[in-house]
């Protein structure tokens, strides 16, 4: 076990991770050495055997860093947050079977709410989206309604899902409104970990920004979860994509024909669509050219989804594809290649 040893004796670091007499920070440093120098198969086995120790080390250090961020909030503390989130990601990736059974369900959910808080910087919120999708990919049908509501609120600009409690937004899911008639005991309010800094670059279109992130992460993270049964990777993607279609596609493509199918296409000529109405929204500061936009909502989101789908259809194969005269330099669809 642990055949790679470019950084000292990894076995000694393994022992120090499990040594309860050592402080949490020391154990964290040695846990990072183990993660960075162990073979992937050995690392999976190590996490499976010592999951309780590993989560304790992670959580204790996360709490310390969170307190430090709220007191100081300097660049060094933000770098420490990045480092501890690296450990959090490894926990999500290497322990999907336990997470699927709701291991540390409330603790992980609380941490993700702190990352997804709308008062955080965009970088932290986007990282929260990425880690939340990893968690949901592992939970699959064992998630609760709250996680599905949160998934439906990850991309700002869409209508809030309705429930028996009224509209659900990311803000009231992270910090539910108080009902003092039920109980006088209330949970502590969740506050931002890293508010936006003065030099942070903003985004004019948050809907497009988070939509692109979500579509990217539900694909590229599929194989990052180390399931013992590899079929769960595809199930995880199917779970996320089915809920994307449920919560977002009806708004992005409100007039989509549900009768259409790749296998049984409708070949009738469709009715002419009305001409879109464009309005000038602003002028370019450098060229003074007018910038127009259609009044139709989610038009940018529609373009993003179409481009995302096309990226899987038009995949460049520079060396393996056949030579077709007149198509030099063109990217061919897979069915032509």
Swiss-Prot record:
User: What interactions and quaternary structure are annotated?
Assistant: Component of the heterodimeric RalGAP1 complex with RALGAPB. Heterodimerization is required for activity. Interacts with the HLH region of TCF3/isoform E12.
Q: What is its main location?
A: cytoplasm
Disulfide bond is among the record's keywords: no
Please name the GO terms that the record assigns under molecular function. GTPase activator activity
What is this protein's name? Ral GTPase-activating protein subunit alpha-1
> What does the UniProt entry say about where the protein is found?
Cytoplasm; Nucleus
InterPro entries assigned: Tuberin/Ral-act_asu
Keywords attached to this Swiss-Prot or TrEMBL record, sorted alphabetically, are:
Cytoplasm, GTPase activation, Nucleus
> In the UniProt record, does the keyword NAD occur?
no
Q: What would be the name of the gene that encodes this protein?
A: RALGAPA1
A single GO BP term for this record reads:
activation of GTPase activity
Q: What does this protein do?
A: Catalytic subunit of the heterodimeric RalGAP1 complex which acts as a GTPase activator for the Ras-like small GTPases RALA and RALB.
Q: Which GO terms describe its cellular component?
A: cytoplasm; nucleus
Superkingdom of the source species:
Eukaryota
């Amino acid at each position: 076990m642990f055949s790679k040893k470019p950084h000292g004796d990894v076995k000694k670091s393994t022992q120090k991770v499990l040594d309860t007499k050592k402080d949490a920070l020391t154990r964290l440093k040695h846990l990072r050495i183990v993660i960075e120098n162990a073979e992937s198969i050995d690392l999976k086995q190590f996490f499976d055997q010592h999951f309780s120790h590993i989560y304790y080390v992670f959580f204790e250090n996360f709490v310390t860093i969170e307190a430090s961020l709220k007191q100081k909030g300097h660049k060094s503390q933000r770098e420490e947050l990045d480092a501890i989130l690296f450990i959090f990601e490894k926990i999500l990736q290497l322990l999907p079977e336990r997470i699927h059974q709701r291991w540390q369900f409330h603790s992980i959910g609380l941490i993700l709410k702190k990352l997804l808080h709308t008062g955080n910087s965009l970088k932290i919120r986007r990282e929260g989206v990425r880690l939340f999708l990893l968690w949901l990919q592992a939970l699959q049908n064992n998630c609760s309604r709250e996680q599905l509501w949160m998934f439906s609120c990850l991309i700002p600009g869409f209508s809030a899902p309705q429930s028996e409690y009224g509209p659900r937004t990311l803000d009231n899911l992270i910090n539910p409104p108080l009902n003092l008639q039920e109980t006088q005991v209330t949970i502590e309010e969740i506050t931002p970990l890293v508010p936006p800094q003065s030099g942070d670059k903003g985004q004019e279109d948050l809907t497009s920004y988070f939509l692109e992130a979500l579509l990217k992460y539900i694909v590229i993270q599929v194989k990052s979860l180390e399931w013992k049964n590899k079929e769960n990777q595809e199930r995880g993607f199917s779970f996320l994509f089915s809920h994307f279609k449920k919560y977002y596609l009806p708004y992005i493509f409100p007039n989509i024909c549900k009768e259409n199918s790749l296998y049984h296409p409708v070949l009738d000529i469709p009715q002419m669509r009305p001409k879109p109405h464009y309005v000038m929204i602003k002028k370019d500061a450098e060229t003074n050219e007018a910038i127009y936009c259609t009044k139709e909502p989610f038009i940018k989101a529609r373009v993003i989804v179409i481009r995302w789908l096309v990226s899987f259809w038009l995949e460049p194969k520079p060396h393996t594809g056949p030579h077709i005269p007149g198509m030099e330099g063109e990217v061919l669809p897979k069915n032509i290649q």
